């Protein structure tokens, strides 16, 4: 007790000395706190993105569709549906005892379902960290369902909290991404019904978790296998629609959507589908869309090259070549990253290892007209 008393006395004396030093210090060197700094502190303490309010809410909502379309290529219809649903909620036209939005993203792999969720998190809440991704294939068995809300008292993991409820409790302003929802057990859907309908869920500790400030997005590949089997599926058969890289017309897109929607009604219960705000079908990507995505994928590479002290430029023919090599009608944009690695990054790596580049050099990438490859030239910046 005496030791603690002495420690307390010393701490109080130190605080008093620092206070006097601060009061008699140089006023010209005092730290000034403005509303932006206070907003950041409040945001860190509460998990609420207060700094987003610096921009007018109406202006941000009005420009959201335009911003997302610049980042997510060839999915304008899907973006419009998501943005309009969010705008209705934020303007107070929807039930307040309901999540901001509950969406189901449908479509084949590599068309931007998860990517749109990430960009939506950045635009809505200011950071990609606001996205919680849960792989629903881990909840295919019924006994795993309790992991979402936390184990009941007396069971292993009772003190850890649920993988869904605990994250939302700590960060209520977020996007919950339930990936491949069709693989989840039926008990998971029973849990989600309450969240989708009332915006709340009770965890294993008996606490009521508020989902009213979250966006819930479920992704599914339902119906894409049926598109392959029908032989007329968009880009799924060898000689089918879109397999030659030509733009896919609206009639074929509507046919693909109808096939997916028909299979969706067979796979999910009506009471589950009725609680969704929007069921959004993503269109298959064609070659012009992949060519546009090349520019987005190269931005991060350009930054890495500039961090090394060099500059980087690429001709349109070289971009078209990479797009054609990275275009697979069945897998969307995923093969594009491998094509950039194999044809662009490997060539840059060889050029860097030669040791002939000087600080400020410009690396020019073009298409070899005689061979099926790219050319890399070392140019000095003027």
Question: Predicted regions: what is each one?
Answer:
Residues 2-382:
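AAA+ P-loop NTPase nucleotide-binding core of proteostasis motors
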């Amino acid at each position: 007790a005496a030791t603690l008393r002495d420690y307390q006395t010393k701490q109080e004396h130190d605080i008093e000395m620092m206070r006097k030093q601060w009061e008699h210090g140089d006023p010209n060197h005092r730290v000034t706190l403005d509303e932006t700094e206070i907003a950041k502190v409040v945001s860190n303490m509460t998990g609420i993105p207060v700094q987003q309010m610096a921009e007018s809410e109406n202006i941000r909502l009005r420009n959201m569709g335009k911003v997302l379309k610049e980042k997510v290529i060839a999915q304008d219809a899907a973006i419009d549906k998501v943005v309009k649903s969010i705008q209705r909620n934020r303007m107070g036209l929807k039930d307040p005892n309901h999540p901001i939005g509950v969406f189901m993203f449908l479509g084949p792999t590599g068309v931007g379902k998860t990517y749109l969720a990430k960009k939506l998190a950045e635009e809505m809440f200011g950071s990609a960290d606001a996205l919680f991704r849960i792989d629903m294939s881990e909840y295919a068995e019924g006994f795993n369902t309790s992991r979402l809300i936390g184990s009941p008292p007396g069971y292993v993991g009772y003190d850890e909290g649920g993988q869904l409820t605990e994250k939302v409790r700590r960060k209520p302003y977020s996007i919950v991404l339930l990936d491949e929802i069709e693989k989840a057990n039926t008990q998971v859907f029973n849990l989600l019904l309450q969240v989708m309908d009332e915006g709340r869920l009770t965890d294993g500790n008996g606490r009521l978790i508020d989902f009213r400030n979250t966006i819930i997005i479920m992704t599914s590949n339902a119906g894409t296998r049926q598109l392959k089997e029908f032989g007329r599926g968009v880009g799924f058969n060898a000689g089918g629609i879109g397999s030659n890289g030509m733009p896919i017309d609206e009639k074929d897109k509507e046919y693909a959507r109808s096939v997916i929607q028909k299979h969706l009604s067979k796979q999910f219960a009506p009471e589950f589908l009725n609680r969704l705000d929007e069921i959004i079908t993503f269109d298959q990507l064609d070659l012009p869309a992949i060519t546009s995505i090349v520019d987005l994928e190269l931005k991060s590479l350009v930054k890495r090259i500039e961090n090394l002290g060099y500059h980087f430029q690429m001709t349109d023919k070289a971009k078209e070549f990479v797009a054609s090599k990275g275009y697979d009608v069945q897998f969307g944009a995923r093969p594009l990253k491998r094509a950039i690695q194999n044809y662009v990054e490997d060539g840059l790596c060889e050029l860097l290892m030669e040791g002939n580049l000087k600080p400020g050099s410009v690396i020019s990438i073009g298409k070899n007209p005689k061979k099926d490859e790219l050319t890399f030239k070392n140019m000095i910046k003027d």
